[in-house]
């Protein structure tokens, strides 16, 4: 729970791990890169399709279609933030890049060194869960970056997101 001088800003305690929209409809798991690339509907996966390694600590990775689906990805009473809501949170925490350190889990259990300025003073406990781009291929070193969707379309091929990085 974060409190501003204007209104409370509430964030969920853990990442989403649902396989259903709010109305109960199934969100399919898609592991194949080519299938992920050709999607025009919602889907989810585990990072590198490895639930044994990543399921306990990290949430599922969802594509833009799942995030933006009118059936709702988040539980009742919750929603995926719009870009303006992320901006409000970041401003409240001191702007970019100061907010990043306040939002990242401190230490090196999940993040690689140097995990710059990580204090988790916001109690957001951002983890480096990576993401899966539209083309479906996973890349980069795990432990270095985490992404969180916004519901704000960027005008081209996706949506705005925020990212937390190990060295910023």
Show the residue positions of the predicted features.
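Conserved positions within compact, well-structured domain cores
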Residues: 1-168
């Amino acid at each position: 729970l974060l409190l501003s001088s204007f209104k409370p800003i509430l964030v969920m305690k853990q990442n989403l791990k649902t396989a259903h929209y709010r109305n109960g409809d199934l969100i399919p798991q898609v592991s194949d890169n080519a299938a992920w690339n050709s999607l025009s509907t919602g889907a989810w996966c585990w990072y590198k399709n490895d639930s044994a390694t990543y399921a306990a600590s990290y949430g599922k990775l969802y594509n833009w279609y799942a995030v933006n689906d009118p059936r709702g990805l988040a539980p009742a009473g919750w929603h995926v933030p719009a870009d303006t809501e992320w901006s409000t949170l970041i401003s409240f925490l001191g702007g970019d890049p100061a907010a990043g350190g306040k939002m990242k889990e401190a230490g090196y259990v999940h993040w690689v060194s140097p995990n710059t300025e990580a204090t988790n003073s916001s109690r957001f406990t951002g983890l480096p869960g990576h993401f899966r781009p539209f083309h479906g291929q996973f890349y980069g070193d795990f432990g270095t970056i985490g992404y969180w969707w916004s519901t704000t379309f960027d005008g081209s091929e996706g949506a705005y997101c925020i990212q937390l990085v190990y060295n910023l």
